[in-house]
Structure formats: structure tokens, C-alpha cells
Amino acid sequence: MASATTLLFHHGSTRVLVARRRCQASVLRPYGGLKPFLSFCSLPNSTAPFRDSLRAKSDGLARAYVTGAPPIVEEPDPKIEESKSEAESKDLISWGLLWSLMSKHKLRLSVCLLTLLGCSTCTLSMPVFSGRFFEVLIGVRPEPLWRLLSKIAVLYSLEPIFTIAFVTNMTAIWENVMAILRAQIFRRVLIQKAEFFDKYKVGELTGLLTSDLGALNSIVNDNISRDRGFRAFTEVFGTICILFTLSPQLAPVLGLLMLAVSVLVAVYKRSTVPVYKSHGLAQATMSDCVSETFSAIRTVRSFSGEKRQMSIFGSQILAYKLSGLKLGTFKSINESITRVAVYISLLALYCLGGSKVKTGELAVGTVVSFIGYTFTLTFAVQGLVNTFGDLRGTFAAIDRINSILNAVDIDEALAYGLERDIHTKKVQDENLKLFLSAGPNVNIRHLDKYYMSNLKSTNNLRTLTWAGDVCLDDVHFAYPLRPDVKVLDGLSLTLNSGTVTALVGSSGAGKSTIVQLLARFYEPTQGRITVGGEDVRMFDKSEWAKVVSIVNQEPVLFSLSVAENIAYGLPNEHVSKDDIIKAAKAANAHDFIISLPQGYDTLVGERGGLLSGGQRQRVAIARSLLKNAPILILDEATSALDAVSERLVQSALNRLMKDRTTLVIAHRLSTVQSANQIAVCSDGKIIELGTHSELVAQKGSYASLVGTQRLAFE
């Protein structure tokens, strides 16, 4: 090891260790060293075509992404450095990103700039012409009245035209930017690791796309009108310049107004950020309570929990009201102080300006213009104060979005598949182009490109899963949010290709965790899962999802029609009505579907609530039949059904399981007796393995479970 050189650097959230080959054995030791990888050479004949490939690519396998140990590369690669530089900016939303998105609309931005100058010029010219108007009236100015009024009429006509052009173009730019941001945030949430969704509630995540992005949206939409935002700034700046040009003696009076307002803005900035944050948090909490209550309305009804939910929501309403009152108090105090500063400035102007007119040092028209500019400055300053207040809310919202979406790393194996599908294939769906508009820096800056280059081709994945065995090899696992609680402890199990394996055991033994690992919602903390001898982490998750199908005890249907729910088995493909009907018939669902009011076009309600449990199961089975995945997982698929529904569903499941590698999890042992092998899980390990008759003869844990259930039915 003395001659081995090691270079350690960070890539975003991924730690990459660049070392000489002599270091590989020590890094692979948590997975049993190199032996597990090289032992593929002794695989059965069914995987013989892959042996040479495995020998030749063992280095690539060693470099592949694995949970728990960093990937290994032999030499630094320029792709890594490129990826590293892209990952330096961790925030999902930054002002640099907003500007880059806006700068794509150069023509509209140019129009906005010109019309903004036109608006401000018209507004700033009006007090000057007002002063001239009074001078003409008192005979001090020899200009004809009709000519002066014509000029004023032109100004009054041009100002709304410029305003319409400015607001229209600025709105178009910002709505395009917001559409891209919504798409990117939605995509970022989708590709987070599973523990992200364990940590955050649905209401919190919904709030990112509604209230938080709404605050960002309002910073432009609510500040492009007169006397707000950019226009207010140009009017303040232009007014100060004109005032010093007209009268250097009176200008400092209004300059004091600007100084006072600047102090107010600084105080406002410090005082309102926590208030805005608490207000947004209270709003998200309310949204989460509403979502959770309505989604579990049957549970609430069954326990007569309406009063409790009303009490909980009432407390949240009061918290939101109090935070709103506090926020309103801050706004009112700042606006009141601003008005007081304006009135004091006006009073000083009347006193000083009037005395100078009396002594002949200033013309009446100049003082009248000053009064007009005072009101212009008043509205503009108040608009700026409101704009700065909106900015505080926007900063708080952006901080909330970035803190949530950067707290947990993205699931790179999933993100890579999406990037590949969207960027390397011709996008047929117009809606997906929103996810391309932000450019590659937004989409893939967090991905380790060198790790991605080591993922295996997906061309052979479907062949592997149809012909190869699925092996869980010395798998250890603890949920990321409970790292001290080991759920699986060295579990090993082989699902033979084309056969049915039943998994039984007491609650908490780790059965559902095995399902989540096979579905790759999580990755093993230690050990590996292979298919046909290939580590499943060598394939991106979007491709893996296409070869694994899960039917749960409570399948989730979308608020779509029956046909659309079945077609969701192939969400990225066009599915014909004939294929949908064929799958429904195979799932014993066709008869009940055609009896529905609109047949296959009948809406199923939220989460399929308008269908019975057996009907939902058969629709889910039809969806899996259409998917035609070689690996099938049945997680308590019939445990909640009555006898008639169970018979129909079990008949459909038998057709679904044919020639597929199937894992069946069931508490009722009568449903697993015909399995090719039965595995008994206890304390995160497989303690017994065999057929029903073999395990009964052993008189172990399985025999005890069988005896217990027999007694329960006697």
C-alpha cells in the first residue's frame, strides 16, 4: 500500500475515490472482497453466456455504483472533473439560473427595457409640464396653451401604450420561466431517494409547487404595474436626478426621504424574514393537514375522528392567522413610517419652496414641479418598500425550496435513466419539452458522469430477467431514517427463474423490506442483489422498473378511467384499446368493467375509491399483465378479499405468474402451499427453505405457523 497513491475529492453528494488497483480489495471488503464478483464463473449453465463478459468486465463491475462504498476508477477522468464543476452549485433555484432562463428571451427583454424607459420618461415628464401649465396660466410663460396641452395629451396617450407593451412582454417572459421552474422542481422531487418521501409529508412537497413557487411568481407578476418593482426604481432614480437639476437647494429635502426609506428597508429586511418563513411554514402545515385528512377520510369516519381533525386544523388556522397578523403588523408599521416621512418632506418643501418663491429665488413652475415629483417619489418609494417586502417572501420561499430539495441526494440510478430517455431520444410528448428547456446544466449537474458511463447496457436486461435467477446475496439493510435498526441481517435467498417462491414469517421479519429492495426503492446497506449473475445496481432504475411488477394488498389506482389505469402498465407507450381489453379479460376484470356506467371510460375516483377491493385488485393485475414483466412480486395480494373475490383474483394471478420469476408474500399459508419453494424469514434472515411438505416434515418454524393457522380455523 505504500506505493499506492490516493486522491480524494468530492463530487456533489457523491464521494469518489481514485486509487491504484492495489486499493480495490480493501474497498470491496464490505461486500466480501473480490471473491463474490469472481465467483460468477461457477454459475449454472443458464448464465454461461455471461461468464466471459463478467471476467472481462470485473473492473467495470468494481467501479459501478454500490451503496455503502464509493465507486473506484483507476485513473482520474476528465468527465469527472467536468461533472464536479457542474455540481459546485448546489441550489436548485439561484438568481443565476433565473437570469439564464430569462436571457433566452432576448427580443422580449429588449422590448421590456425600451418600454420601461418609455413609461418612466412619460411619468417623469408630467410634473415638468404641470409646472409649465401653471406658468402659462399666470402669464409667466409665453407658450400657447393649446400647444402645451397637446404635448401633455401625447404623454398621457403614450404612457398606457408603453405600459401595456412592458407588462405583456414581462409577463410572457416570467410565465415561461415559471413553467420551467415548476417542471424542474417536480422532476427533482420525483428523482429523490425513497427516504426523502419518508421524511417529508405530502403537504410540504405540495407547498413547494404552490405557495413557495407562488411567492416567486408574484415577485414579478405583482411588481410590473406602475410604481412597483423596476418601474418604481427607475422613477426614484430619475426623480432624484431631475430634482437636483431643477433646484439643488430643494433636492436635499427629498433626498432625506430616500435616506429614511433606505433605513426602513434595511430594518424591514432583518425583521420580516423569520416572519415570512413562519407564515409559509404555517401554510404548508395547513395544506398537509387537509391532504392527510381527506386522503384518509374513511379512517376518520370509522373512528368518528371528525372532531379531533377539526381541532387539529383549528389550531393550525389560529397559528396561520397569528403569523398573518404579525406579518401585517410589520407591513403596516413600515408603510406608516414611510407616509410620515413623506408628509414631513412635503411640509418642508412647502415651507422652504414657498419662502424662495416669495423672495424670487425660485419660479412658481419649479415649485409646482417639485410638488408633482414629491408625489411621484412618494408612490415610487412606497412601491419599492412593497417590492422589498415581496422580495423577503421570495427569498424565504427559495430558501425553503433549496433546503428541502438539497437535504437528500438525488437517486442517481433513477435520474440517469430519465436523462437518457429524455435527452438521447426524440421527445414525442410536447409536455416533456418543459424539462429540456432549462438546459443540461440544470438537469444533470448533480450526476456523476463517470459512474453513469460504467452502467451496463440495458439491451440484455430483459433477457437476463427472463432466463436468470434473482439472488439476494448476504444482504444487510437498515432504513436511512432508522440507521440503528437493522432490518435485514445477512439474508441470502435465490428466486429460481420461472418458478414461484413464497416468503412467510411473522410481522416485522423483513418480508416487505425484501420487496422494497427487489423493487430498488432502496439499495442494500451491504451485500448485493443479482439477476443472471449481474449486480442489479449495474442497471439504471428506469430500466429495472420495466422488468419488475408488483401487486400489493391495496393497489393504488389514479383518478383516471379504468382503461387509463390499465394502460399505465406501459406509461411511456401507446397502448391500443384491444390490448387493454385483452389484459382485462386475462385478469377476470372485463365482465365487471363493461357493467360500469361508462365501461372502460368510467372514472375510478381518487385512489380507485369508486371500485371494490376485488375490482381494484383485478385492474391492478390487468395493469401488470399488460406490463409483461418477467419478475413478479405479490405482496399480500389476496389477503383483504372475500372468498368470491379471492377466487377470481387468484385465478387471474395464476395466469399472471405463469413462466415468471415470482415472489409471493402471504400470511395465509393456504395461498403459498403450491409454491416451488417456501422461505421462512425471521429477524432479517432466511431460517428455513424448502417445499411445503419438506418444511412441515422438518417440524420447525414453518410447521409451527401451519399448526397455528389450523388451530385458528378449527
UniProtKB/Swiss-Prot annotation:
**PROSITE patterns membership:** ABC_TM1F, ABC_TRANSPORTER_1, ABC_TRANSPORTER_2
| Entry GO MF terms | ABC-type transporter activity; ATP binding; ATP hydrolysis activity
Q: Where in the cell is it found?
A: Membrane
The UniProt keywords, alphabetically, are: ATP-binding, Membrane, Nucleotide-binding, Transmembrane, Transmembrane helix, Transport
Locate the residues binding ATP. 505-512
A Pfam family this chain is assigned to: ABC_tran
Q: Which residues form the ABC transporter domain?
A: 470-708
User: Membrane topology for this entry?
Assistant: Multi-pass membrane protein
Domain ABC transmembrane type-1: where?
109-393
Identify one Gene Ontology CC term for this UniProt entry: chloroplast
Q: Which superkingdom does the taxonomy of this entry point to?
A: Eukaryota
Q: Which residues cross the membrane?
A: 109-129, 161-181, 240-260, 340-360, 361-381
Fetch the InterPro entries from UniProt. Answer: AAA+_ATPase (IPR003593), ABC1_TM_dom (IPR011527), ABC1_TM_sf (IPR036640), ABC_transporter-like_ATP-bd (IPR003439), ABC_transporter-like_CS (IPR017871), P-loop_NTPase (IPR027417), Type_1_exporter (IPR039421)
Which family, according to the similarity comment?
A: Belongs to the ABC transporter superfamily. ABCB family. Multidrug resistance exporter (TC 3.A.1.201) subfamily.
The protein in question is named ABC transporter B family member 28
The organism encoding this protein is Arabidopsis thaliana
- Lineage of the native species? Eukaryota, Viridiplantae, Streptophyta, Embryophyta, Tracheophyta
